[in-house]
Amino acid sequence: MKLTRKQWMMLVVLVLGAFVTVLNQTLVTPALPSIMTEMNVDQSTAQWLTTGFTLVNAIMIPITAFLQDRFSTRKLFVFSMSLFAVGTLLAAVGLNFPVLLGGRLVQAAGAGILMPVTMTVLMLVFPVDRRGSAMGIFGLVIAFAPAIGPTVAGFVIDQADWHILFYLIFALSIVIIVPSLFLVDNKAPANKGDSVLDPLSLALSTLGFGLMLYGFSALGSAGFTLVPLLTTALGIVGVVWFFIRQTRLPRPMLRVDVLKNRRFLVGTIIGMLVQGALLAAGILMPIYVQSLHGLSATVSGLVLMPGAILMGIMNPLAGK
């Protein structure tokens, strides 16, 4: 069964939405040295632009299951893209670090909803015999975004200003939102009641991981002083409490029982270590290239490009 013209147009809108959100994640790292200089913040503070984004993004993913059970696909897609656009504009006009960070966190909330919703629409709307092709195009574009993001960002920073990056992303977001109002299929919410949002679990995961992340970050700059140690300890307690609570809820926010599978647990730990190393390299490499070697932002972007290209090539191969 061939895809209709409307389905192709909808696929383009969905893929572009995901592409912009993934591209946005890779644009910030080459801009970190410029942001640190302009806003007079140190490395441990500036890294919150990436780690904070990742944290909020991860927290929003389980919440999305609850939202999908209650709102239609078009409403969620438009809402998430609009939220992402608002955060992008806030970051673009931010003249101080708190405003910039706030914009990034709002961006992350929108992106955290958008990706699962996009996957759901692809699975619900496209026929079974064409679903593989749609997912393949989606995966290819998502792999392409990190490959060009740092280089594009470096070029823009050298030629203009890092604020322009967010204005460009904002413009692309608006271009995607307008046609999505007409092209994205408005599938009704499931209303199964399978997804339950436990307020305490949400609070524990947000505060636990947030405090732990802040504590580890502060330890790097302030050393083993009272505040970093206390926030780290409180964060660890919150995370442990969160996991214990998930084992006792009949319908948990996060199914932690899958970690009883030894292979899954080992794979998860390896994935965490790899992602941690990649995130650290993405933050430190532009600072190392630009601040210590005095090279341009474009060069720092080019340094990150080969790794991103190889990841894009190896991801589909690893799946086989």
What is the predicted function of each stretch?
Residues L32-I35, V121-L122, V156, V184, ...:
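Hydrophobic alpha-helical interface/terminus motif in multipass membrane transporters
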